[in-house]
């Protein structure tokens, strides 16, 4: 109903079983991309092109090296969640230490080491406050880094709030990875209303 022909599923701490994944994709005639969302010492990182979770991936430097070796692609997910909304009991994942100073301007955040270890920045996340998404977009702009969007949906309710739109049609995981490395994508909004457009600040 929304016009989705494909989905990328980023399971926490490890991708779905490959055979189960392929069976589901074939059964429903949909392009499914298998990936994972890894909890690291520098927040959550989306990892594409990695076959399985490996020991040491909780260190983003280790994950980054493994991704490069495998021809993968990694993205810092919702990097500034809770920076402005500041929930009572949770620190932002990029600034976990009590004495970590929270950024106010994009220039305050641009030197965080995470941005030297990932390929792109998620700037449109369905589970993150608009102000924090906008801030991520501004930081990525200062750094001239590629940007992505994602629903971060944990049920069908949130699917498609934000997406990553690709210039060319994606038919499989290989084409998906090639498009990521080519930079031929952008975050988008409006899929749910039938008015897909680039996400901008």
What are these regions (language model features)?
Residues 2-4, 15-30, 38-55, 65, ...:
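Charged catalytic cores and adjacent phosphate/nucleic-acid-binding surfaces used
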Residues 10, 36, 77, 151:
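Active-site flanking residues adjacent to catalytic metal/cofactor-binding acidic residues
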Residues 33:
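General small-molecule cofactor/ligand-binding pocket signal
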Residues 57-61, 77-78:
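Ordered, amphipathic secondary-structure segments that act as subunit-interaction surfaces
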